[in-house]
């Protein structure tokens, strides 16, 4: 199979042969870069919170329209605020074949009680995944980094705890943080996928948790129905320390059109902003960014000097309207969701774009990318692709340093989403290129008045949902594209 990207020919053979030569125990590690702030500790986190007296988990909805069982747990008070948009999300999930049990719960600080609920669902209904929404208990892990990394003691949230339902997690010093993970009644592999939606600690731009959640579910629905689509291509933006490894070829296993940016004199703040901002309109559906970072900024090299950094900040995501839907953040602690205004969450809760970010809550990120991008490119949803990667790589990819690299990995967003090429063509995308634009108007005009080809299927041109394709559909599409009119309907012609 041949992939094309920027005039380069990518072949599966080249990708695989290149991988065999990479020593993942010798990859330049990511670093915490912020000189003024340190990661919040477990003690600081717990002492700053007021926990509920109990979990009080209540089953409020049982789906019966799908055949793939999942479990959704949502903060009880948040559910009351967002139930209108959340109900649309549930309908979308069931239309895609999922059968959700929905529970409301409180954050009582007891991650074990939350996990027991998942274990019960796994044993009784064989759930394949879970989505946690809002303020819920967070599991923490502690470890010493490898000596080659400096040997520091680190504490971090670990969502793998909720994915492995039959392993053994122990807290030898009884300080509230797990410090070991082994086989239990079953193995220590991840058993289910997990996604987390948490917006309560995002504070910029007048943000409120309710508004951010409502907007996220609105974006989610628009993506599923075809109203929010970008082009079927990816950007691999790889800074100096990792530009030699060919990771852009691994992204190409999901996106045949992958644009690599790996020149050490090119990867910097200004160039990154120019490529991803909406006004440039590159329309990348997916982004891999590899950059030394903190939860609040990317530290991109400026040239080749060891300390010549140019920073892209969390608050700028909204300001420049970053035009990407799906992120892989090879960026130290960028998804440390216990910190206020972490970038992993801002990338998905920005107003216009953003649906999923995959990143780490600690120093480290993903390696062995091909085990993630290959299933994505074969039609798996993001949760399935992440679960597959966890099973294959989380304990082994980097040898003895694997836990240091990977135990902070977390998926923020809705894991049931897939790449747009695996979704139905949206009504209005008459030429079936994945986006609705002026070219579709031209296509309809040519069909109606110049003997051009018939839309296939015809419903793609029936944007007014009157079961015919005529000049009204042309006018409707123009109004939608250029006058902020309503989006196209489903179509029935």
Stretch-by-stretch model annotation:
Residues 13-14, 466:
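Serine/threonine-rich, low-complexity intrinsically disordered segments
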């Amino acid at each position: 199979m041949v992939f094309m990207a920027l005039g380069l020919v990518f072949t599966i053979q080249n990708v695989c042969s290149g991988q065999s030569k990479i020593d993942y125990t010798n990859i330049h590690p990511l670093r915490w870069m912020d000189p003024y702030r340190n990661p919040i500790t477990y003690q600081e986190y717990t002492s700053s919170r007021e926990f509920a007296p109990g979990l009080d988990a209540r089953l409020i909805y049982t789906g019966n329209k799908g055949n793939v069982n999942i479990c959704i747990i949502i903060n009880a008070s948040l559910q009351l605020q967002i139930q209108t948009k959340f109900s649309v999300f549930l309908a979308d999930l069931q239309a895609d074949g999922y059968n959700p049990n929905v529970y409301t719960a409180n954050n009582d600080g007891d991650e074990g009680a939350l996990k027991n609920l998942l274990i019960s669902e796994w044993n009784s209904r064989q759930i394949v995944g879970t989505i946690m929404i809002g303020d819920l208990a967070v599991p923490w892990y502690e470890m010493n980094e490898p000596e080659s990394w400096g040997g520091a003691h680190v504490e971090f949230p670990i969502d793998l705890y909720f994915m492995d339902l039959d392993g053994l997690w122990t807290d030898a010093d009884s300080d509230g943080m797990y410090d070991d993970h082994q086989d239990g009644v079953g193995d220590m592999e991840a058993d289910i996928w997990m996604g987390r939606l948490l917006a309560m600690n995002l504070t910029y731009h007048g943000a409120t948790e309710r508004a951010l959640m409502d907007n996220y579910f609105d974006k989610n629905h628009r993506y599923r129905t075809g109203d929010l689509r970008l082009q079927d291509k990816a950007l691999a933006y790889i800074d100096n320390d990792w530009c030699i490894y060919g990771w852009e070829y691994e992204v190409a296993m999901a996106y045949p059109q992958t644009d690599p940016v790996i020149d050490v004199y090119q990867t910097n703040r200004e160039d990154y902003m120019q490529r991803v901002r909406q006004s440039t309109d590159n329309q990348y559906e997916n982004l891999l960014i590899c950059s030394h970072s903190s939860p609040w900024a990317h530290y991109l090299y400026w040239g080749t000097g060891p300390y010549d950094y140019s920073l892209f900040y969390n608050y700028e995501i909204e300001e420049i309207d970053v035009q990407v839907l799906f992120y892989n953040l090879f960026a130290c602690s960028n998804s440390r969701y216990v910190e206020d205004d972490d970038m992993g969450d801002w990338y998905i809760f920005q107003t216009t774009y953003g649906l999923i970010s995959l990143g780490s809550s600690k120093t480290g990120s993903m390696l062995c990318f091909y085990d993630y991008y290959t299933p994505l490119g074969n039609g798996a949803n993001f949760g399935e692709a992440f679960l597959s990667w966890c099973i294959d790589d989380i304990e082994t990819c980097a040898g003895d340093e694997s836990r240091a690299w990977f135990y902070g990995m977390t998926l923020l967003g809705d894991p049931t989403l897939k790449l747009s090429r695996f979704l139905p063509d949206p009504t209005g995308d008459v030429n079936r290129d994945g986006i609705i634009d002026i070219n579709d108007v031209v296509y309809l005009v040519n069909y109606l008045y110049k003997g051009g080809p018939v839309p296939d299927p015809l419903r793609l041109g029936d944007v007014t949902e009157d079961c015919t394709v005529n000049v009204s559909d042309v006018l409707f599409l123009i109004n939608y594209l250029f006058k902020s009119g309503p989006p196209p309907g489903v179509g029935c012609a």
